[in-house]
């Protein structure tokens, strides 16, 4: 059974999904970060594939992507690192990147090798729904690779229902229409949007992302979904760390600590 399926069957609340950019701060940090995220209590890890034109990402993730590429990160290197990490942890792993990267590598080859490296799911923000239905779904299903789609406050209800049916991993509920990394208090308008998504009673688990940055915003997001995704705040913590393993553990512990 896919590890994502196992996770959501075993736990349906307060799921912590942490995103980081593979190959950042240093090329060989990927496995160390994965192992320490798992050890510290993260439920799910979203591994970002560095890309030169990350259109959905804010400045923090863009800079980390450029640094990772300069460090020498490639898809081949990433798959090798993931295979090494998978030998030491069974935590669900999701790759987040862009469909252009998959197309350049070859879709079937990419999915096959990602699965062999221990990847459980994909998030590809630029993958059109029609392209997924026409070609990519069969490839993903053949390798038990779950695919997650994103919805935003501007996504029409009918479209949300369609995407909810197509997402085979979880539904990525984007908290705002801005790029990633814009943190702050979750607004009343955002809460109303989350409640609207809840009311649709969609079949897939829902994780809220974009702007989740600390224990308080994580807990608030979890009131409206099965869990939340934290990315830019973690990358900022890694950027200033002398000890990546320690910084990773301390970050997760800070997110999971009780909120007064």
What are these regions (language model features)?
Residues 78, 195-204, 213-219, 223, ...:
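Alpha/beta catalytic cores of nucleotide-metabolism and tRNA/nucleoside-modifying enzymes
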Residues 42-53, 119-123, 127-130, 171-182, ...:
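Glycine-rich phosphate-binding active-site loops on the catalytic face of alpha/beta enzymes
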Residues 145-181:
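Histidine/lysine/aspartate-rich catalytic loop segments that bind and position anionic ligands
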Residues 1-10, 27, 52-63, 70-83, ...:
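Active-site-adjacent beta->alpha loops and helix N-cap segments on the catalytic face
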Residues 16-20, 45-47, 93-97, 122-124, ...:
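Hydrophobic faces of well-ordered beta-strands that scaffold small-molecule active sites
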Residues 27-37, 155-166, 200, 208, ...:
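Catalytic cores of alpha/beta
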Residues 18, 37, 45-48, 114, ...:
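Conserved, mostly hydrophobic/aromatic
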Residues 41, 114-121, 140-147, 165-171, ...:
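Glycine-enriched alpha-helix->loop->beta-strand junction motifs that scaffold or abut catalytic
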């Amino acid at each position: 059974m896919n590890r994502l399926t196992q996770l959501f069957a075993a736990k349906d609340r307060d799921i912590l999904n942490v995103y980081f950019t593979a190959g950042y701060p240093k090329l060989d940090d990927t496995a160390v970060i994965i192992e320490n995220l798992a050890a510290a209590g993260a439920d799910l890890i979203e591994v970002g594939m560095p890309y030169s034109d990350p259109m959905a990402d804010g400045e923090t993730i863009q800079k980390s992507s450029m640094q990772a590429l300069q460090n020498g990160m490639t898809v081949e290197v990433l798959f090798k690192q993931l295979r090494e990490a998978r030998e030491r942890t069974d935590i669900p792993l999701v790759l987040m990147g862009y469909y252009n990267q998959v197309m350049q590598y070859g879709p079937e080859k990419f999915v096959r090798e990602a699965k062999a490296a221990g990847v459980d799911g994909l998030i590809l923000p630029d993958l059109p729904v029609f392209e997924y239905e026409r070609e990519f779904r069969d490839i993903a299903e053949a390798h038990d690779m779950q695919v997650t789609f994103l919805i935003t406050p501007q996504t029409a209800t009918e479209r949300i229902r369609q995407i909810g049916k197509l997402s085979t991993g979880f539904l990525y509920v984007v908290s705002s229409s801005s790029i990633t990394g814009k943190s702050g208090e979750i607004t009343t308008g955002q809460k109303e949007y989350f409640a609207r998504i809840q009311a649709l009673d969609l079949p897939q688990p829902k994780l809220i992302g974009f702007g989740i940055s600390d224990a308080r915003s994580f807990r608030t997001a979890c009131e409206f979904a099965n869990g939340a995704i934290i990315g830019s705040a973690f990358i900022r913590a890694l950027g200033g760390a002398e000890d990546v393993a320690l910084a990773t553990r301390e970050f997760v512990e800070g997110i999971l600590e009780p909120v007064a």
